[in-house]
């Protein structure tokens, strides 16, 4: 039994749920949600195995006619839409939702019969409609059951509450004389009876299936099981206890020994599972290099060989993904280490983003307009921008973000928002990474707050849990790691709470920190606060507020009316017009920016804009500068952008500046504004992450403010990107677009108004890992071209390696198989005449480790090879001054792969050992006696080194062949299929099993021998079972059922699917082996009797 799970919840509008949406999801179907005039489509969801829509026997005619001639899903759609239409309240309870785990011991057909029995006894018998589906998740088969909360009447539905009838037939009244009512759908006592009824029904069906299993659904306490937390006294605690009876020196030595014990144990654990190191590193940083791995290993590993072996295993682990290759920087000649991350982190961040999008599309935590107006009236000094931000965070969506610099009024805004939430009946709590920030949030905004770690601790202890009436405000969100942010997003999602993220605009920049906050803000959008409105014109300020509220259509009309929406027929014409207008309006005393969403557009616009300035003589052709992405030319007056953080210069990724001096591979740039303005000198050999800054992506402009902005609109824009692009200016804004492409896609306003368009295909279950990796790198400001090339090249090289490995392995396996008499013969079948039958237990054809990996693992622990390698290592140390350098030069790996290379290397080593490195000691007149002795010793050991290495390679080759043969035999064995039995054979085996249970083995054998065809089929079945599992695998007492040790041993390492197949076929395989054993016993007795009679006859002749 996976889990004796039985949970009941209510589908209620108050919690943002819908009966139609729930039904569509469970039926994996497309349904029309009539109340909201929209369609829900879950047809892509998988796992639906069976579905039924069952009505009570005495159902009214309207219900019968409604579902007549409809499919199950269609009947469900029609019924729950009627329920939704009947319930008028905004917080109406619509249905009871029951989730039940099914016993994995039963077959699919048996589980369906079980659920039908339960529904008939405990649901429809009480006049309830039962809409249920069977989901077959691997290892977790379960049922979702939706039932009604109102009785059915002739024209619709009755009341949810009914008067309790007393013994006299009249309505029961309480002491105050009022009529007592009860819920028609049942109270807590009814729920307990409902739950107990399920377990009773389940146990009955388990017994009918011949399974000696009973499920007790009660709590541990009610079962009399005393589960108390145990206290683990570790070695450190014991050392402290012993300290009281020892002197100070003894305690000190004892603690040192304890430290070494811990290091040794950690070393062993890392060797068993090197991925522990990845877990340690990724708690601190999401992108790392070899040095980070080495730092962790150095804490615990002393042996150089083990150290380097673990380094290789970690960096080549399937869990590791290389984002950028190691490379020599062209401009500096400095070697940049390769950058890595883990697949788990990429998937975690992608899932976090998907959850954030899901929350943003849920409407459950809205605050009524009159409540907001009351809050605004109490805070008369709120600006329009602050009010707009409050409206944004107080919206119905279950997640929201707000951005504002320190002093921009975030605290005042959050205080007013808290009052509005509390007035609407919500509990508001907050958290921050640092205690000081949490304290400030509580003191200034009145939001009860703790550190994030404190919240996690309380949740793990079952305290202070969030619920669907909780608003959680997370301050300084840009400081929170992806892992921790993912936890809070997941917690809010599961608890039904609302999450409000508060951050700083600097944290929106694509730098190394704050990637989690950016990943969410980019997906859901945000409200923005500024101490001073950017726009100078009032109509522009009003338009920015409308953009913040999502009124994109109104804003487009406003800007069009003011001549700021520049229409062209084609995008190419729009680009030309944009550059022409930018050139005409260019004023060196004003800050300007061209914005586009696509990088290729940005690169083109930068080139065209600078070309115009050079053409007019505003800037010179300039001097060449070796930038990371190729040569650029810079001259005084050029606008530039920094693309990487550099503390020594005081610049950050996305920061803009203006060149004031330029020379070959050197510039002086002015950065900052007003009193923070300063100059920095940049030389390409020290910093080369620069580009022209006339145009930039909309993402990089987040948090920026300039005088004039030109925007190139594209079909990839959405509501959030439009908001960012159209609110960066102080004085003027122009939007340029090609009308033809927008017209084909629904129109300009529709495209600019769409929500999360760039995420409409982002589904964590289906999104490609490649795309997730690029988004992960983008959020950290990495060079996407380099990342894409690295991933693609690594994938290609891996594929080529696997192809060659497969070819080499095939040749080796054929040779080994022939040597061990395992020749492979070819079979031909007529596929048209062969009727495919699914086996009872499928053969295993895929394995968690490749053949090469499995053999390598055994070679790694081979004691003979270990001893031989120690001799090789010792000889290297005796012969060479730098043994590790010489070992690398010898390239043992290449020798192991190619016998010709090995012979050449061994010959070279014996005759010219100096070619691999300097020998130990010295010769000549100036050499000391010790040096001469070292050289003599080295020369004497050269032949021994070559011989030791040759012996090691020969011994390893033999061991490798042996292990390959063993592994091949094991894999061929588990690849054997256990065939399905015909109905006649199954019936015969059932009769055999009954006879065995009656201890009537002769009758069992008689049944088996009665039909020759069935007998032959059972013999083939038994042969397959023996070949795969062994002749007596199912005969011991421990193999009586699947609860014994035999089952655990046989299924060790299996995936849930194959394990379930073995479990299902267990009794059949055991029966056939018992039958075979009885046959062998009878045959042995016959032979013994024959031999006895022969001997007796021989004696009588004498």
Curated annotation (Swiss-Prot):
Q: Does the record carry Membrane as a key word?
A: no
InterPro entries under this entry?
A: (+)RNA_virus_helicase_core_dom, Bep_BID, Coronavir_polyprotein_1ab, MobA_MobL, P-loop_NTPase, TraA_Ti
Q: Which residues bind ATP?
A: 404-411
Signal peptide coordinates: none
Q: Which UniProt keywords apply?
A: ATP-binding, Conjugation, Nucleotide-binding, Plasmid
SUPFAM superfamilies for this protein: P-loop containing nucleoside triphosphate hydrolases
Q: Which family does it belong to?
A: Belongs to the MobA/MobL family.
The record, for NCBIfam families, names: PRK13826.1, TraA_Ti
Protein name listed in UniProt: Probable conjugal transfer protein TraA
Q: Which organism is it from?
A: Sinorhizobium fredii (strain NBRC 101917 / NGR234)
Q: Cite the source lineage.
A: Bacteria, Pseudomonadati, Pseudomonadota, Alphaproteobacteria, Hyphomicrobiales
